Amino acid sequence: MARFSFPCFPNFGGFNQAVTNRGPEISETADNWVSPSDIPLIEPNSKEHRMREAQLGGHTLRSHGMTVARTHMHDWIILVLLVILECVLLIIHPFYRFVGKDMMTDLSYPLKSNTVPIWSVPVYAMLLPLVIFIFIYFRRRDVYDLHHAVLGLLYSVLVTAVLTDAIKNAVGRPRPDFFWRCFPDGKALYDSLGDVICHGDKSVIREGHKSFPSGHTSWSFSGLGFLSLYLSGKIQAFDGKGHVAKLCIVILPLLFAALVGISRVDDYWHHWQDVFAGGLLGLAISTICYLQFFPPPYHTEGWGPYAYFQVLEAARVQGAANGAVQQPPPQVNNGEEEDGGFMGLHLVDNPTMRREEDVETGRG
């Protein structure tokens, strides 16, 4: 059966082939290398499976999916609570601040439709990264990576959404098109204190008091910012080899998020300060959430989640206690390779297996 490949990642299939070719030898040394009882989140039932536990490709949805999810049950419960809190914030009435006649100069821009529809924001901020995570899972077969990427992304977007809407309701800043929301017929009316007396549609007026910060922008940077960090770790964008093509891949999601923010100013739905604050908020939350599950992208182990390396360390400690000869844990080889992929683009595989294969084939 033909093996699926992706042009930009020609080396990524090498690890799976190496495991297949070395299956008998791996099985013979399995008992001496790892004892599964001390590996967290693992319940292996065969000798061959025990060896694959500590190797990339051994943690699949079928074998470990439910176990990993149960281990992080409290995280998923908090995630559901965040969804409920976000729904409550969408119902809460925002603060209606004083809007005087002299302020209308900056609030009389045309009332336009959204260049980027509201329904499209979850699509590119959440569904697009999820599709990429799933694609990489089918290439690597690492449920830790998939689970933590999905959980981190959802936390990034939902925490950002809750903070954004909470600030929106508390600040109540009028949008640049507030005049036409408040006075759709163009006839302004003010009370004795000089505050506006709006006679437009109540829902439109209510939405007009939610300018700061920009929700489109914060959502965009929280989702696509997380994706950018994830991709930079997977392709080792900061490995010191000088492949500019890697940076292009990392910057592309951020560029799209920035363009979304610019569209909010062009549509007169937000002031530039709203967009700047929204982008800063989304990018900060996405970075914090990413670093909860993954090493920094510039780290030599930035290609995998913390949980994967914790499994390897547990296996190493157990092997040392049993007096077994240990293999070094996988690390990213920072040296240039002949088969470094198209313009240096490839997903990082397991360098330990690659080194052993090189020795056998005479390339080492």
Curated annotation (Swiss-Prot):
Keywords assigned by UniProt, alphabetized: Chloroplast, Hydrolase, Membrane, Plastid, Transit peptide, Transmembrane, Transmembrane helix
Its membrane topology: Multi-pass membrane protein
Transmembrane domains' residue ranges: 76-96, 118-138, 143-163, 211-231, 242-262, 275-295
GO annotations of cellular component type: chloroplast membrane; plasma membrane
EC primary class: hydrolase
GO molecular-function term, one example from the UniProt record: phosphatidate phosphatase activity
EC number(s) from the headed UniProt entry: 3.1.3.-
Keyword presence, Protease: no
Gene3D superfamilies: Phosphatidic acid phosphatase type 2/haloperoxidase
Superkingdom in the source lineage: Eukaryota
Similarity comment: Belongs to the PA-phosphatase related phosphoesterase family.
Protein name per Swiss-Prot or TrEMBL: Putative lipid phosphate phosphatase 3, chloroplastic
Name of the coding gene: LPP3
